[in-house]
Amino acid sequence: MQNLFPKIRRILLKAFVPEIYWPIKVDLDGVQVPVRGMPLNFGTKYWLKKGEYEQDERHLITKVLRPGLKVLEMGGSIGVLAQIIGEKVGPKGRVLSFEASERLVEISTEMWPLMPQLQRVKGFVFPVNNGENIFVGEFQTEGSELDGRGIWELRDGMPGNTWDLRSIRKEFNFDPEILIVDIEGGESIFDAIPPDFPDNLQSVIMEFHPHIYGIDGQARLEEKIIECGFSLVDRSGQCVLFVRT
């Protein structure tokens, strides 16, 4: 029942807002983002049209991004930020973008042309070095295929079904210098497993979700990152930039 109202709202918006209302493309940080005709919900198209889609992450990434860097994104959604980062790091850089939703991976594949330095991966992923026992048994959506989060648990002595920094390094030969995280509350894993970030990681941009674990919970999770040798240097909305000291 709780998902019924959003579904009805989306049907009404689609009926009363014609597709021609949306621009064919919008320019975000030099990247042409297709909008009209794309299988995106009203809210996503609205924020794209206003130029404010993922603006907090886009603002913070400009402070640390340079050509040639290796960037790991956890929670790629429709791939806008990954595409922007791929353009900025250039052919000598590398971007690995993980997304848990199969539908979102399909949409991002449809929206974007191939880019040699950018690889998109479907899978559950957590921002810890060793999360081999993290198991996600359910992917919960919030009434829209464009929103959702994995419900995780620890299974001691049993292998999980998720990616972590260590398995990514091993499987993809990828040791990122920048980590960007927006996994809808999955950052609360820090309460169970310390991040233990590898030395090569220099910057972390994380979107927090205090509506899930509270303001005090966010402060506690931020401290877990600081304890790994990082300083909190900037905030934008619910996104926080940490840089290694």
Q: Where is each model-derived feature located?
A:
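S-adenosyl-L-methionine
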Residues: 1-111, 172, 210, 215-224, ...
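Short, well-ordered alpha-helical microsegments
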Residues: 82, 105, 128, 187-190
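General small-molecule cofactor/ligand-binding pocket signal
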Residues: 119-121, 233
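Short, conserved active-site loop motifs that form the nucleotide-linked donor/cofactor pocket
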Residues: 93, 118-119, 177
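Active-site segment flanking the S-adenosylmethionine/decSAM binding pocket
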Residues: 70, 74-78, 151-215
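Glycine-rich adenosyl-binding loop in Rossmann-like folds that engage adenosine-containing cofactors
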Residues: 29-58, 121-174
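Short, hinge-like loop/turn segments at secondary-structure boundaries
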Residues: 113-115, 135-141, 197-199, 222-224
